[in-house]
């Protein structure tokens, strides 16, 4: 019986997801090791060469997608990760998504415009495919936001805040119930159409829809597996009309 239990531990895998504001110290920069991110990612991925799949946000913009994908691959290789394969999932490779997902160890959900990526994810039937995925998911910015069961689309492009047809809640991938807003220190200073990102858009939306938001600075991330989720690093939450800082860098917070 003991042998059988040990065998199960080695063979039964479940998905692990890392939802980041950004895994890098700067745009197109090296991996950020803050809050033990690199160590935990190494532990989750193991030592074997990886089969990675990078999901772009703009499937029809090949140059932009290739640049983002290549920068992410280089950042991983620079800290010692090796790849057996590394595939950019865009319009050209979309027909092979089921086969690619079956061989994938590391699924990277890129950043940028959430609604555009959300549309592509549903075209790929990714919410269905990801339910059977047993590898590691890495969410980056918009990719992290789209990982929620019901994703919140922050109006960040001119015209979106006042567009009555702009859907702020959209079905996501269903990895988590939490809605994470990335790049806290950058976004809190930004405005769009004369509105402050946080004070005039996200906080009123939290009240309107009755949903809490987790605000992550770069370097903070959420790890989830088997229904348990923890945040590593500094983050803030707006819930029930209250905006508060929950944790600082270096701290781990278990989410309820």
Task: List each model region and its residues.
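Catalytic nucleophile loop
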Residues: 110, 131-150
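Short, well-ordered alpha-helix to beta-strand connector turns
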Residues: 104, 133-134, 176
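Catalytic-core regions built around general acid/base machinery
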Residues: 100, 123-135
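C-terminal and late-domain segments of enzyme folds
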Residues: 15-47, 59, 66, 70, ...
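Portal/gating segments that form or line small-molecule/metal binding sites
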Residues: 54-55, 59-116
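Short, Lys/Arg-enriched N-terminal segments with co-localized hydrophobic residues
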Residues: 1-14
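Glycine/threonine-rich flexible loop motifs
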Residues: 114-123, 191
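Structural motif
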Residues: 18, 106-110, 138-139, 179-180
